[in-house]
């Protein structure tokens, strides 16, 4: 009896902020241990490895990430571009714009309906600014990286392409977000992974699944948002995203159907209490309790 091929498994982390006073080494150890247990095909590290872009912070981040026993694609975030930190990023991690492709073995390709997977990773940061952009001079390069029409296509970026609830003033999308979204949808990209504001959230837009990750290793948390990181599983039917929490819970966050390119399940831990803590719902009357 033939055994089922293994799904494509990815781990997405962001905003570890080495050098931050609230950096939690125990949480980092736990995340690395659990990531190695998952044995992902690839780990996507989508920015803000450091607190202020200093060389010693990058060295610390590199030491931590070297303990993950999987290939990695890493992009810088806005904190990493502070203090000319992008030079230290390049020294420790290589190009700020990169692509990665892995072909599937024949049995796995047949079962997953894809020849392999391609990741295109871009630097959306601007030195010493919190906002960012990609820039139209990069669009042709992005198109040229997605050369395999039957690959699972993944785009990695630090900043948001779509506003995320509960993140404050919506100045966190890149300046050319609309143009970039149009390019990615035209290219048939399946998945966007991003970070930035420490709030995990999931959007489905014109067939594109956008996974925004939280922070797994600091106490810089908004409202009632707990520390978390994301596991993404692509099987023959769907893309499933799971949130991992620091108490070792693993929770299904969203499901996107591959054939119809539509979201089947949305929402996860965001409760009325979370929404109220971020002023997205009115506070309950005295004596009432928010829904959890």
Which residue stretches match the model-derived regions?
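Short acidic, glycine-rich surface-loop motifs adjacent to enzyme active sites
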Residues: 149-166
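A short C-terminal boundary segment appended to hydrolase-like catalytic domains
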Residues: 235-292
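Beta-strand-turn-beta hairpins that frame and shape the catalytic cleft
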Residues: 2-11, 109-121, 148-152, 205-210
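Active-site neighborhood of phospho(di)ester-bond hydrolases with catalytic His/Asp-centered motifs
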Residues: 12-14, 42-48, 72-78, 123, ...
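Extended active-site neighborhood of metal-dependent phosphoesterases/phosphodiesterases
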Residues: 59-141, 183-185, 231
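N-terminal active-site segment of His-dependent metallophosphoesterases
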Residues: 1-67, 84, 105, 147-148
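Conserved beta-sheet core of the metallophosphoesterase superfamily
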Residues: 169-238
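Active-site environment of divalent metal-dependent phosphoester hydrolases
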Residues: 19-22, 51-56, 78-87, 127-130, ...
């Amino acid at each position: 009896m033939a055994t089922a091929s293994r799904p494509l498994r990815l781990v997405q982390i962001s905003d570890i902020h080495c050098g931050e006073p609230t950096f939690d080494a125990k949480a980092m150890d736990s995340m690395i241990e659990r990531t190695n247990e998952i044995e992902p095909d690839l780990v996507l590290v989508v920015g803000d490895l450091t607190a202020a872009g200093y060389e010693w912070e990058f060295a610390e981040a590199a030491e931590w990430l070297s303990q993950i026993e999987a290939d990695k694609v890493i992009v810088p975030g806005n904190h990493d571009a502070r203090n000319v930190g992008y030079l230290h990023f390049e020294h420790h991690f290589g190009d700020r714009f990169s692509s990665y492709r892995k072909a599937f073995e024949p049995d796995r390709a047949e079962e997953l309906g894809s020849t392999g997977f391609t990741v295109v990773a871009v630097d959306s940061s601007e030195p010493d600014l919190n906002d960012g952009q990609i820039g139209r001079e990069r669009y042709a390069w992005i198109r040229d990286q997605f050369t395999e029409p039957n690959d699972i296509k993944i785009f990695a970026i630090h900043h948001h392409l779509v506003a995320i609830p509960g993140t404050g003033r919506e100045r966190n999308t890149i300046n050319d977000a609309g143009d970039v979204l149009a390019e990615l949808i035209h290219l048939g990209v399946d998945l966007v992974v991003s970070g930035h504001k420490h709030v995990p959230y999931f959007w489905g837009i014109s067939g594109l699944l956008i996974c925004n990750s939280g922070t797994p290793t600091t106490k810089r948390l908004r409202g009632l948002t707990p520390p978390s990181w994301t596991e993404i599983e692509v099987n023959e039917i769907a893309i499933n995203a799971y949130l991992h929490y620091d108490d070792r819970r693993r929770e299904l966050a969203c499901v996107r159907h591959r054939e119809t390119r539509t979201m089947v399940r949305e929402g996860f831990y965001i409760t009325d209490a979370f929404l109220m803590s971020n002023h997205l719902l009115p506070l309950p009357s005295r004596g009432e309790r928010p829904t959890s």
